[in-house]
Design a protein with these regions (language model features):
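Active-site hotspot residues in diverse enzymes, especially metal/ion-binding acidic/histidine motifs
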Residues: 1-379
Length: 379
């Protein structure tokens, strides 16, 4: 009997021998979702059971060095990525407001969320070197089932709190960034085009996240998307994501945020007048479709006129006439990375410290950088 504890300890040592001591289970979950791979698929690649992969990801057991080598190959990440390094905060899927929830496969949404988690981690790393805008979003007290009037009032209060008293919002994305929101645009390559913009205010890092679609190559649509996600951030913390009611509320918020009723109602035409709609489009930075919908919602366009306008818009398709230029781009993440480099810590140094592949780090930083051409003067 006295030898029993010794035998148990010896058996435990034998089982743990050859296992990776500094394995980070969170990083496995992130890498697997980035690769758009299920646990069962990964299990087949590395010749273990799906239950074993689940145990790895939940930190119940660690993979052997052989299993980790297979994981690294299957997911296209170096071994070092799966070892403890920079903490990658979690964004729970239940808190992420996807506009395309019903049309996007769950694994593709998980892939986009994993990219957002990496972006939050990179921003956290950069914040060790430079000061970033603190989170300064207003608190809006709304009832559990707010009316259209309540939502409109909330959008007006949000404009004032964010420093937009009247007129068009100059740059919605920069406004979000200035108030501490991390905004990034998903890479066009490797991600499902059906993944639309989404947001979450309930991140482990405490910084709100907005991911924009790379395919909305239009300024008007990107501005509305960003305003829609702002509505989620301000109105839907703790609210179950994905319902039609919640999405409709965010749409109403965005419409009032970009086109305040008190300022635009009298200027909206009472008939299908495309010249007037185009002038309003240029002034307010919104799409013709959004203006037509707003005119009908506010009672300026009758049902028959609204129907005629929508038939014409459908005939034109996308992009609609009168483009406003390229979409609004985020800039904080890219600009902060440049400041870090100016202070002597290049991206390669950051990548090594964070145990994130340099190529992956470049992709994340690029997602938060304006791609406007820069003037360089050489001698």
């Amino acid at each position: 009997m006295s030898d029993q504890p010794t035998r148990v300890a010896a058996a435990s040592r034998r089982r743990s021998s050859g296992r990776v001591e500094d394995f980070d289970c969170r990083r496995l979950a992130v890498a697997r979702r980035l690769a758009c791979m299920s646990r069962a698929e990964l299990a087949r690649h590395i010749e273990v059971t799906p239950a074993a992969v689940t145990q790895y990801e939940h930190g119940l057991t660690r993979p052997t060095t052989t299993a980790l080598a297979r994981i690294s190959f299957a997911l296209g990440m170096p071994r070092e990525f799966f070892c403890r390094g920079l903490n990658i905060p979690e964004v729970r899927s239940s808190t992420a407001h996807f506009r395309s929830l019903r049309t996007t496969p769950a694994n593709r949404r998980a892939q986009a969320l994993a990219f957002g988690e990496l972006a939050l981690a990179v921003l956290d790393l950069i914040e060790r070197y430079v000061d970033l805008p603190p989170v300064r979003l207003p608190t809006l007290d709304l009832s559990a089932q707010p009316s259209q009037a309540e939502i409109g009032d909330a959008a007006g209060r949000a404009r004032k709190a964010l420093g937009v008293d009247s007129g068009p919002v100059p740059h919605v994305v920069r406004l979000l960034e200035a108030h501490g929101v991390l905004v990034v645009r998903l890479p066009a390559d490797g991600f499902d085009p059906r993944v639309d913009a989404f947001s979450s205010s309930e991140t482990a890092s405490g910084r709100p996240l907005v991911l924009m679609s790379p395919l909305k190559d239009d300024k008007a649509r990107s501005r509305f998307d960003a305003s829609h996600e702002l509505g989620h951030l301000l109105m839907h913390t703790g609210v179950e994501a994905g319902s039609r009611i919640v999405e409709s509320q965010a749409m109403s918020f965005a419409a009032e945020f970009l086109m305040p009723r008190a300022e635009i109602e009298d200027n909206l035409p009472t008939r299908v007048d495309w010249e007037t709609f185009h002038a309003l489009k240029r002034h307010w930075g919104v799409s013709l479709r959004a203006l037509v919908y707003r005119a009908h919602k506010l009672g300026r366009l009758s049902d028959p006129s609204y129907g005629r306008a929508n038939r014409q818009l459908k005939q034109w398709g996308y992009p609609e006439p009168g483009p406003l230029g390229p979409p609004e781009q985020p800039s904080v993440l890219g600009a902060a990375a440049e400041l870090v480099e100016l202070r002597g810590a290049g991206l390669s140094t950051l990548a090594e410290a964070a145990r994130i592949p340099l190529g992956t780090l470049h992709a994340v930083v690029a997602a938060g950088r304006s791609d406007r051409p820069r003037l360089t003067i050489g001698v």
